[in-house]
Amino acid sequence: MDDRNSVSVGVLGSYGGRNLGDEAILTAMLDRLRADRPDVRIVVFSRDPAYSRAAHPDVEVVGWEGVCRERISEHLRRLSVLVLGGGGILYDTEARRYLRLVRTAQDLGVPVFTYALGAGPLTDETDCTWVRATLADAAEVTVRDEESKLVLEEAGLTRPITVTADPALLLTPGEGGDELLRAQAVPRDVRLVGMSVREPGRAAEHLDEEGYHQLLANVGDFLVHRLDAHVVFLPMERDDMRHAHAVVSRMADADRCTVLHGTYRPQQMLDIVRRLDLAIGMRLHFLIFAALAGIPLLPLPYAGKVFDFAQQIGAPALRGVVRETAGLLLAEVDRLWDERPDRVAHMTTRTAEMRLRATGTADRFLAYLDRTAPRPLVLAAAPTPAAG
């Protein structure tokens, strides 16, 4: 395709970082864009170009980390629009990295559309300044939850902000979940409870590692005895495995646990989640997958985005993941299991509403694209002359 005359959409997020949540977002976004605008040339800006090319061989991939302004400008100036998002990329010390590239695009006259962004924690004045300076000039600003809208407003952004929902809510499952579990020697003749952990870090700076490891070990042992269950830890990124093993090492019933070690695509992980009987976890997109699969779930909110999601789907959620909440947490697990038919029915209704809002993000972007970069005209074929 001659990109000088084509419509070109760039997509910038935490892609190529081998986080299944971010990859689920990208996959769902690309699926909708390809379905509606097959004429569009897509360029994904990736942290690991080789990984992204293997996952999405039908799009162009550009590495951007550690690339100077002059070189990245060669790719940006060819775009019709740059999509920032989705995913939680606007937080302290990280936001400025993405927004420098956004400002470069804007300086080149490339419009920017923010797509169901997640924001927070965002208190560093340098990052807040970047937010105000760049997003004020965006064509449109959409965020995935009310928490993110509040964070951007507190950072000083005064323009209209539209709340939609996480793009990963539109992910479709793949196949082979049973085979993937069998390959990891997960038994299939018992109840399966999925658990999700994560590492402390800038996005979870108040997380007490030792405390939450022991808390989840207590929960795991309770599940084994209360439900006669096998506990499966589902890593959403590579470092989750280390924390999962730390939890298992503190359990009395470690032999009733499996930590998955495979490499999975988002669609495969969603299909694995569909095989669970119960889901308890910290990672937002693990919880989104459970909601999509109709699995009763208990969020463990380490950050506002998880608590916000729990509220939106009507799931119970304790404030914080600390050892002192062990008794309350075990009681909530017990209640969730006993009330699971009603809980799932309620959650399914709420999830359908969120999927409509996620569809709304795509609709808004595609409408913007149609206004600024119209679809190519398709000329009707001339009628075939009648045989004489």
List each language-model region with its residue ranges.
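Active-site anion-handling motifs in enzyme catalytic cores
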Residues: M1-G388
